[in-house]
């Protein structure tokens, strides 16, 4: 089980750095990373993006809000939802439905793009990661109420947790045809770092004050580049070298197309992350649907104040972990475990004003294919290329995580480009007196710098002034 705890700690460290692509940038003029949404998109110039400064970002997508967990108490302090002054009914009103939490890490380590006639090429190295959780509503009732009412039965089925971290090297190619079609492909070589997945199909808990009767059916798998190291105790160095010579590899592809239906109307579509990683060493735990008795333990935390919040939640999570009974299981060691990536589909439609092409309206539909963690979003965007080197975007989105307002600005003259944007301002629009965000934890903030180079090949080239006719030469001609 040391393997599980080490990988879990690694996954949690990734969670604190999590971020996601800036979907507000899909229609943003001059945004260098549009090709990551659709490989058919071509940059207005070539660019170089260096480590650290090329993108600093953080965020999460969730149906939860901080106010669902922290409540004011009679002492004037904030208490968790476990506090005795917080009623069961109030907690269930806020946390009684299925909860989704998705975070994505997309850390560009190095990126490069350049143009060659009608083609555009990109090459980048990045670290990718996903942390996803789907929790049944009864899980919070279990944590809040427990067996305080005497006998209680909880249905914790369809609980799903997953995390994948991998390194990626990608090459992208886009070609323009007939001055109206752009077709693109992006090839990705992947190397797995860590993967942890838990899928509980059935979990029923019957509780009383003395013991819990648990019945569970599900599985958990753990894969990591550290898997061999943690199992080898005699010669760690040789184990490490052997593992590095035989890494967990994978392959993925992005496909995209963009079509100018009319002069002022563009349709685009793409499929991103179509592929998988093959893990060479995995530990798979299977829970049989046989009932067992779990004695649990008592928690003395009062739920008041923010200093002991971590202790309270850790204690409750320890109780939940005990329900899975993984400690008593012998894992099945699998040498080949192929896991698909979470695939994403984008469909966009952009309309420009005939009398002012610098102003456009865009519709973007996004769907994430990821099993129980799948989600869908529709986003309406207004985009303004105020100058050839300065652009703005504002948008409104509706998704499985609720509704949100986003915006971005992009300063992109030749030689230097800086961008700042967010897909949702909502968490920053409402705060408690303790400066706790009250709205849904559904946001991201992206800031970065890169260095454009080469001839401008964007939508707004400089107009060539016609030379004035020489009046004298005209008279001589007459």
Task: Identify what each model region corresponds to.
Residues 20-478:
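Subset of outer-membrane beta-barrel
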